[in-house]
A protein has these predicted regions:
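Amphipathic alpha-helical dimerization/coiled-coil segments
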Residues: 79-130, 134-137
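Short beta->alpha connector loops
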Residues: 24, 146-150, 202
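Primarily the HKD phosphodiesterase
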Residues: 131-186
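HKD-type phospholipase D/PLD-like phosphodiesterase module
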Residues: 172-206, 211
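Signature of lipid phosphatidyltransferase scaffolds
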Residues: 93-96, 222-257
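Short solvent-exposed loop/turn micro-motifs enriched in small/polar/acidic residues
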Residues: 48, 199-203, 225
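Basic, Lys/Arg-rich alpha-helical nucleic-acid-recognition elements, primarily the DNA-binding modules
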Residues: 1-84
């Protein structure tokens, strides 16, 4: 078993080849182009996989064997999970993951390859400018905030004005501050039919947002400290994961309007 694991995971070339063949048979030229690899580097990896009967060759076409199909089917979720943590191990290990429900922890491979974004000091509480077009063209936006974000009311109202279905979940203290100290912004949200919710639970993320083409998640540190950095992903499966997270908190919140 260890030799099989070594064969698959100790070579990026072999692993990437198997991932590509999971989509169907490919000829050698397609493989070289897709993986951006020369034949002299590719053929030794193909031979090793053929020797283990993980892939089979039919003329110039390569495909997964029946055993290979089973192996790759089980391998893909693990590969996706490794993509989630690769490059962001420090963030995931030092932040409080308790706000992520267990059923979504088990499906974290759905997040795919994530980006860790750290805003500069002059724009700590501002919405990322490179996501504005994506946000404003979204038909559905679901957000959660445990802290008061000055950008939040106009952003949510703007999306609603554009015809989006907007759901905004707020910590109870944040909601009260918005309603009492920012009455104008609060009324704008109501006028534009933004669905408002109050979340009173003790365990909560710092914030998250899921729109049509992106999701982002911000967690508190394990000692409760605030961190401006956020995890972002753009894959369809990540959006599905983000919508499940949003629904989890909507189901546990009180709807205001």
């Amino acid at each position: 078993m260890s030799s099989l694991i070594d064969l698959i995971f100790f070579s990026e070339k072999r692993k990437n080849l198997l991932v590509q063949l999971a989509d169907g048979p490919m000829d050698i030229d397609e493989i070289k182009e897709t993986l951006n690899i020369k034949a002299c580097a590719l053929m030794p990896q193909i031979k090793k996989l053929k020797d283990m009967d993980i892939i089979v060759q039919k003329g110039n076409i390569y495909e997964l064997s029946d055993i290979g199909e089973v192996i790759v089917e089980k391998m893909l979720p693990l590969t996706s999970l490794l993509d989630v943590f690769d490059g962001n191990k420090d963030y995931w290990s030092k932040h409080d993951r308790a706000p992520i429900p267990k059923h979504l922890i088990k499906k974290m491979d759905m997040l795919g390859k994530c980006i860790l974004e750290e805003p500069d000091l002059d724009h700590l509480f501002e919405f990322p400018k490179h996501l504005c077009d994506r946000l404003h063209s979204s038909k559905t936006v679901k957000s959660f905030y445990s802290y008061f974000c000055p950008d939040c009311p106009p952003i949510q109202a703007g999306c609603a004005k554009n015809g989006a279905e907007v759901h905004l979940i707020l910590d109870e203290k944040v909601y009260n501050r918005l309603k009492n100290d920012f009455e104008g912004e609060y009324n704008v949200l109501l006028e534009n039919k933004v669905s408002l919710y109050i979340y009173s639970g003790k365990i909560r993320p710092s914030s998250f947002m899921v729109a049509d083409t992106f999701m982002m998640l911000k967690l508190f540190g394990k000692d409760g400290e605030f961190d401006h950095r956020k995890i972002m992903s753009f894959t369809p499966s990540a959006l599905e994961w983000g919508n499940e997270l949003a629904q989890y908190y909507i189901d546990r919140s009180m709807k205001i309007n």
